[in-house]
Amino acid sequence: SSDVCSSDLPPPNPRLSDSITVIASLNDQLSNWRGTPYRYGGMSRGGVDCSGFVLMTFRDKFDLQLPRETRMQAKIGTEIDKDELLPGDLVFFKTGSGESGLHVGIYDTDNQFIHASTSRGVMRSSLDNVYWRKNFWQARRI
């Protein structure tokens, strides 16, 4: 909530504390996976879904184990304000109804995030984009 002063915010996990390193790791992951098609339940080059991409990124780049499903990823860590986002924070969207209508990505920098988009596969998008701004749900720090 907006009445929390920033000193009360949780620091990121130690593995995510150096933003420069985190951004480099996310860029590397994006270049390795960019264009991989979206496939629900997928966890491979043949196709990956949004929470699978997040899980693999945190496992392979930060040695952190996250839950497999978006709805479970939305319960870990601490909710933070959108304007407090740091590289490696998770961004969640409600793009439809019910649990299948949830979407997750990883905040990068400059108001951008990397994710497995249903229409274009693994890519970088902007939080300023009308669609993502309209459907933004919450941000979480791991």
Positions of predicted regions on the chain:
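Short, small-residue-biased leader/transition segments that mark boundaries at the very start
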Residues: S1-S6
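Post-signal-peptide N-terminal segment of Sec-exported extracytoplasmic proteins
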Residues: D8-G46
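Aromatic- and glycine-rich peptidoglycan recognition patches
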Residues: N13-D18, I80, S97-L102, Y107-I142
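Conserved catalytic core of Hanks-type protein kinase domains
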Residues: N32, D60, Y107
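Catalytic cysteine-centered active-site loop
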Residues: T36-P87
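Structural motif
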Residues: G88-L90, N111
